Amino acid sequence: MGGSSEQERLLVSIDEKRKLMIDAARKQGFTGHDTIRHSQELDCLINEYHQLMQENEHSQGIQGLVKKLGLWPRRDVMPAYDANK
């Protein structure tokens, strides 16, 4: 799963793409070729960020549930394997 550095990278990319889209819209209008291209690329970045956030929430949710239910391996229940025995 992606970490916070991936989230930060995506947020920076989203902000940069948004600025490019706004600049293109000011120069070419809302239906200009570059405006639409930047808008579509921005949509992809936002979708990627949203998917990453959902994956992180799911992963954290599963880990929290496992710990809450006491299913996390404990040393007293599952001692370390000793190959010499």
UniProtKB/Swiss-Prot annotation:
Result after altering I36A: Impairs sporulation inhibition activity
One Pfam family here: SpoOE-like
Superkingdom per UniProt: Bacteria
Effect noted on mutating I46A: Impairs sporulation inhibition activity
Other notes: Mutations that block the onset of sporulation in Bacillus subtilis are called stage 0 mutations, or spo0 mutations, and at least eight genetic loci have been identified in which a mutation can result in a stage 0 phenotype. Stage 0 mutants lack the ability to form the asymmetric septum characteristic of the initiation of the sporulation process. In addition, these mutations have many pleiotropic effects on the synthesis of a variety of transcripts by minor forms of RNA polymerase in this organism.
EC number: 3.1.3.-
InterPro entries: HLH_DNA-bd_sf, Spo0E-like, Spo0E-like_sf
Lipoprotein among keywords: no
Similarity annotation: Belongs to the spo0E family.
Entry's Gene Ontology molecular function annotations: hydrolase activity; protein dimerization activity
Quaternary state and interactors: Interacts with Spo0A.
Modification(s) after translation: Probably degraded by FtsH, the last 14 residues seem to form the FtsH recognition site.
Protein name, as recorded: Aspartyl-phosphate phosphatase Spo0E
GO biological process: regulation of sporulation; sporulation resulting in formation of a cellular spore
Effect on the protein of changing Q40A: Impairs sporulation inhibition activity
Regions that span the bilayer: none
Keyword tags: Hydrolase, Sporulation, Transcription, Transcription regulation
Its job: Aspartyl-phosphate phosphatase which specifically dephosphorylates the sporulation transcription factor Spo0A-P and negatively regulates the sporulation initiation pathway in order to control the proper timing of sporulation.
